[in-house]
UniProtKB/Swiss-Prot annotation:
<feature type="binding site">
    <location>
        <position position="54"/>
    </location>
    <ligand>
        <name>Mg(2+)</name>
    </ligand>
</feature>
<feature type="binding site">
    <location>
        <begin position="52"/>
        <end position="56"/>
    </location>
    <ligand>
        <name>GTP</name>
    </ligand>
</feature>
<keyword id="KW-0460">Magnesium</keyword>
<feature type="domain" description="EngB-type G">
    <location>
        <begin position="18"/>
        <end position="187"/>
    </location>
</feature>
<feature type="binding site">
    <location>
        <begin position="69"/>
        <end position="72"/>
    </location>
    <ligand>
        <name>GTP</name>
    </ligand>
</feature>
<feature type="binding site">
    <location>
        <position position="33"/>
    </location>
    <ligand>
        <name>Mg(2+)</name>
    </ligand>
</feature>
<dbReference type="InterPro" id="IPR006073">
    <property type="entry name" value="GTP-bd"/>
</dbReference>
<keyword id="KW-0547">Nucleotide-binding</keyword>
<protein>
    <recommendedName>
        <fullName>Probable GTP-binding protein EngB</fullName>
    </recommendedName>
</protein>
<dbReference type="GO" id="GO:0005525">
    <property type="term" value="F:GTP binding"/>
</dbReference>
<feature type="binding site">
    <location>
        <begin position="26"/>
        <end position="33"/>
    </location>
    <ligand>
        <name>GTP</name>
    </ligand>
</feature>
<dbReference type="GO" id="GO:0000917">
    <property type="term" value="P:division septum assembly"/>
</dbReference>
<dbReference type="InterPro" id="IPR030393">
    <property type="entry name" value="G_ENGB_dom"/>
</dbReference>
<comment type="similarity">
    <text>Belongs to the TRAFAC class TrmE-Era-EngA-EngB-Septin-like GTPase superfamily. EngB GTPase family.</text>
</comment>
<feature type="binding site">
    <location>
        <begin position="166"/>
        <end position="168"/>
    </location>
    <ligand>
        <name>GTP</name>
    </ligand>
</feature>
<dbReference type="GO" id="GO:0046872">
    <property type="term" value="F:metal ion binding"/>
</dbReference>
<dbReference type="GO" id="GO:0005829">
    <property type="term" value="C:cytosol"/>
</dbReference>
């Protein structure tokens, strides 16, 4: 059963273990908290109509993995000093968190911005997987995504197989998204096991 664990400002306040983590990040007010609640099938994340409400790193337990909610980029309605602080919080998590196995970038399907493009490009050469989730599908007509997914993928510089559309409000494709997250974690675990085996074999060869 999914549940909230803790909020953290500093790196040394993060949970200390080897549990794999999936991070969700997006511009302020794209519906990250609503999406987390939809995935949990209950309210475990605070929602707000005020952009920039999430200003800490929030950790949620989803049994087989942790879901981590980062502050929204774009930093609407906060001071320059706070913008610098939030950017540092995001950078320290994305740059140094060893538990991180995948990032799901949440975007508003109605409003894609240059901030979204810049963030997507940031993930190009990272060691963890990167997916884009287009939220608020309920706000567009049914054929919009299929008619525009190649254009959207090109704009965000991502392949169409790493693009998913959902509606947190109406629970559209939430089960599909959760299944993808679990699949990514399973793959990360398998890769870690394989890596350990290869390290062991290499060590044994050196001893010989």
């Amino acid at each position: 059963m999914a549940k909230f664990i803790k909020s953290a400002h500093y790196f040394d306040q993060y949970p200390i273990d080897k549990q794999f983590e999936i991070c969700v990040i997006g511009r302020s007010n794209v519906g990250k908290s609503s999406l987390i609640n939809a995935l949990a099938n209950k309210k475990i994340a605070r929602t707000s109509n005020t952009p920039g409400r999430t200003q800490l790193v929030n950790f949620f337990d989803f049994n087989n993995f942790r879901l981590v909610d980062l502050p929204g980029y774009g930093f609407a309605k906060v001071s320059k000093e706070k913008q610098t602080d939030l950017a540092a919080i995001i950078d320290q998590y994305l740059g140094y968190r060893q538990n991180l196995c995948a990032v799901f970038q949440i975007c508003d399907i109605n409003v894609l911005t240059n901030d979204d493009v810049e963030m997507s490009r940031y993930f190009e050469n990272q060691k963890y997987a990167h997916f884009v989730v287009l939220n608020k599908l309920d706000k567009v007509n049914k054929s919009y995504f299929n008619n525009n997914k190649h254009k959207i993928a090109k704009f965000l510089n991502i392949s169409t197989d790493r693009l998913l559309c959902v509606s947190a409000q109406n629970n559209i494709n939430i089960i599909t998204l959760f299944a993808l997250m679990k699949k990514v974690v399973i793959q990360a675990k398998q890769e870690k096991i394989l890596s350990k085996k290869e390290e062991k074999m290499s060590s044994e060869e050196e001893i010989k």
